[in-house]
C-alpha cells in the first residue's frame, strides 16, 4: 500500500491535478489498484456542473492513467522518469461519479515494449462499473529544455 506522500515521490502530479489518494495494491510494471475519494470541494465541481456536480469523465480516465503511471514508475529501471499519456481506445462511461463517491481505480499493463505501453483501466464505485478504457503511454526522461 502507498500513501499520498509515497505516490508523490513516484509521479509529479500535485493538487489540484493529483487524482489518486492511495494505492491499495501494486505489482511493479504489471498492475495497480488505487482509490480517489471524491470530495464536494473538488475544484472541477465549480463549473461541472454548478447545480448538479458530476466528475468529468476525462478526469476519471486521468485518474486511471495516474494509477498506471505509479505501476510503471515504481519499477527500479523507471524511477525518476515521466509517464506521458499518448492515447485512449475503447473508452466507455457507464455511471456518473458524484461528491462523496470513492472511485476504485484498477489498471493492468497489457503491453509494454521499451518505453511504449498500453494499460486496461477499470473504474468502479461501490462495485458498479463507472468507466472502462485502454490507455496508451510513453515513458520519457525529464528535460530542462
From Swiss-Prot:
It is an enzyme of class 4 (lyase). It is found in: Cytoplasm. One of its GO terms (cellular component) is cytoplasm. Keywords: Cytoplasm, Lipid A biosynthesis, Lipid biosynthesis, Lipid metabolism, Lyase. It catalyses: a (3R)-hydroxyacyl-[ACP] = a (2E)-enoyl-[ACP] + H2O. GO terms for biological process: fatty acid biosynthetic process; lipid A biosynthetic process. Its EC number is 4.2.1.59. GO terms for molecular function: (3R)-hydroxyacyl-[acyl-carrier-protein] dehydratase activity. The active site is at 48. Disulfide bonds: none annotated. Involved in unsaturated fatty acids biosynthesis. Catalyzes the dehydration of short chain beta-hydroxyacyl-ACPs and long chain saturated and unsaturated beta-hydroxyacyl-ACPs. PANTHER family: 3-HYDROXYACYL-[ACYL-CARRIER-PROTEIN] DEHYDRATASE. Belongs to the thioester dehydratase family. FabZ subfamily. This is 3-hydroxyacyl-[acyl-carrier-protein] dehydratase FabZ. It comes from Geobacillus sp. (strain WCH70). The gene is fabZ.
Amino acid at each position: 500500500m502507498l500513501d499520498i506522500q509515497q505516490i508523490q515521490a513516484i509521479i509529479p502530479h500535485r493538487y489540484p491535478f493529483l487524482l489518486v489518494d492511495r494505492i491499495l495494491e501494486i505489482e511493479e510494471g504489471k498492475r495497480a489498484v488505487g482509490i480517489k475519494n471524491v470530495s464536494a470541494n473538488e475544484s472541477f465541481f465549480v463549473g461541472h456542473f454548478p447545480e448538479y456536480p458530476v466528475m468529468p469523465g476525462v478526469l476519471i480516465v486521468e485518474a486511471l492513467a495516474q494509477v498506471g503511471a505509479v505501476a510503471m514508475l515504481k519499477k527500479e529501471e523507471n524511477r525518476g522518469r515521466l509517464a506521458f499519456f499518448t492515447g485512449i481506445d475503447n473508452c466507455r462511461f457507464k455511471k456518473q461519479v458524484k461528491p462523496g463517491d470513492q472511485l476504485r481505480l484498477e489498471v493492468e499493463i497489457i503491453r509494454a515494449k521499451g518505453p511504449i505501453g498500453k494499460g486496461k483501466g477499470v473504474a468502479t464505485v461501490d462495485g458498479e462499473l463507472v468507466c472502462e478504457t485502454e490507455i496508451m503511454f510513453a515513458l520519457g526522461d525529464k528535460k530542462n529544455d
